[in-house]
Amino acid sequence: MRLQPLSVSLVLALTVPFALLPAAPLLAAPSASARQADAAPVLVTAAQWQQMASEGSRYPWFAKEQARSQKTLQKMMKAGIDVPVPRDKGGGRTHEQHKRNYQALLAAGTLYRLTGDKAYVDYARDMLLQYAKLYPTLGPHPEGRGQIPGRVFWQVLNDSVWLVNAIQGYDAIRDALSTEDRNTIESKVLRPMAEFLVSEPKNYDQIHNHATWAVAATGMTGYVLRDPELVEKSLRGSQKNDQFGFLRQIDLLFSPDGYYEEGPYYQRYALAPFLLFANAIERNEPQRKIFQRRDGVLLKAVDVLVQTSYGGLFFPINDAILDKGIDTEELVAGIGIAYARTGDDRLLSVAQQQKRLLLSPEGLQVAQALAANKAKPFDYRPMLLRDGPDGDRGGLAILRMNGERGQALVQKDTMQGMGHGHFDKLNWLFYDKGNPVVTDYGAARFLNVEAKRGGIYLAENRSWAKQTVAHNTLVVDEQSHFKGDWKRGEEHAPQVRFFQADADTQIASAMMRDAYPGVVFTRTQALLRHPDLALPVVLDLMQVHGDKTARYDLPLHFNGHIVSTGFEAEHFPAQRPVLGADNGYQHLWLDARSKPGSEPRSLAWLLDGRFYTYRFGSSAPSQALLVESGANDPEFNLRREPALLQRVEGQKDVTFFSVLEPHGEYNGTAEYVHGADSRIREVVRTRGSDAEVIELRLASGARIALGVADDSSAKGEHSVTVDGHAYRWSGSHARIDRSKGDGK
């Protein structure tokens, strides 16, 4: 798990080649005297520093960032150096002070190079010498969690983050220090910390974002200390057998499209060490061609991370904090490095939204390009991002219409996402008008808020946020997918059936086996545009096949204020029952419940001046339940959010079908309402011999039909008759429109 945001706005990124190590196999670490013979900076060259110092003030973005950094650091310097004995969890005083210290070390090294002011050197040196006194006295952190506590921080991950930052600041001042001070700092702090990280294989020899930070920290330290052995272990694993290490992580954690296994939130977090260390490798060993590895997957990952956002915020799948977005400092580093290597002017518009850049060679390039007005709009587009190292372990389908703040549908057909993954196969989210409309809870956590259990993941993360009922996908017999075992979940990925993205029809379909014994479910979703509809609509088809009768629940978590319920229901205004006893159900209040029925129903809500009408039905009698999160939550850790749950009892097979329609406008200031009535009159589902058709009947008389074959590989013709009209198509699926007056 991840606790600390990296202060990347000052990260010293690396661009042009600087050959330090030979192409031949690396040898044992050189002697201390040999390492000290050359103290020149290697993470950013002296020539690059000189260019930034002489040219940076000419470019407003760079000059503004430098001024901001100077103001922040001078405030820290005025407060004095504080290197406390570690004692607190995340968010506590000593924890936060050590964070501020690595930020200060990074800033001091940067500003020394940009200004030539030796006061910055003195400040950084004195702080590092205090760490040289403290670090040898430290054992496992007193608040350490799990099997691998850190020394400076309560988890070893944060020690890695400290070193990634501190080593860059140290590299910038190293040649301004005396030999004695260099020896003390390196032998008492930097080398012992790097060796501590390498000595913990349960953290270091892993395929995980924790290990990425660790290998980046040790590898960058190895380059600065001229220690080829440290570099080799960072690249190939502590045993140098290529089973772990940085290169193996690149090969296994990203799909060929650049999608990161743990999802966007953790892609954002891991992006900084991946790119910063890759830059260090490119500088010192350009013959490795690290940015070309796997067809440039690290640079693809930058584009993918921006693509997996809406309204500036990342899609909150898996253990995600909802307020993390493209202005996060890790992506500031990513945009700068990616722009320097690709020259893609569309990345500059992202930099403009971030309102930040690096005080680095890449940051200077971004500032120069922005001053030259080269920025172009970023190309947010529909896409299928394959998951898994070979791209065959499901994927994330993104359907988009009407630009960055238009309509976006995200169908989550990805792998488990390791321990940070949620039990939500074939889950979906929907965005419109800059807002999340069909929502995902993300993580139950208040990051670094000490009053909320020290800022760690709360107990409700396991009891609610990870559970399947907290998401918009199928629940069988009130059990979560894989019975809540993420390691079992890692073994089974969805199968992508098809994906299509045209101007008026975008569609994705996937199948999931093994989430429940004997149950197979398939979800097909489409984003459809039609001239008789005000805005694109979402069509959703969930087909479930089981080998025994079961209870099937299909939740829809939505954002907005309910306007109308198109079904009769029993209400519980005086006393709110709790929906269930476990697997997330214990956290749901039951507010209303309909009787079982087969007729299509509707629910309408209002969000940010726009209406949303959700029409839904099923092939077997179902109940509609209106629920809200927050039950059994004595510490008020959960947000109170509404959901609609469709429930079918005692069936082996069932098909759920629905359409979500955005429409109309409510303006409270001007006191008017336009288009509050749905333009869809009815949604009809019809089953054929080997396919299904969902037909939308519009108020205009037009009809939109989506035909979906059971076998997505079938090339032959399919036919389904709806009220006397035969819909025929070939292949896996087809959209078929009928205008008013078309005969049967």
Predicted regions mapped to residue ranges:
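Boundary at the C-terminal end of the N-terminal hydrophobic targeting segment
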Residues: 23-28, 32-34, 39
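Catalytic and substrate-binding regions of extracellular carbohydrate-active enzymes
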Residues: 357-575, 652, 662-665
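Short, hydrophobic/aromatic-enriched beta-strand segments in well-ordered soluble domains
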Residues: 556, 613-631, 654-666
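Non-catalytic terminal regions with compositionally biased, polar/charged low complexity
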Residues: 644-654, 660-744
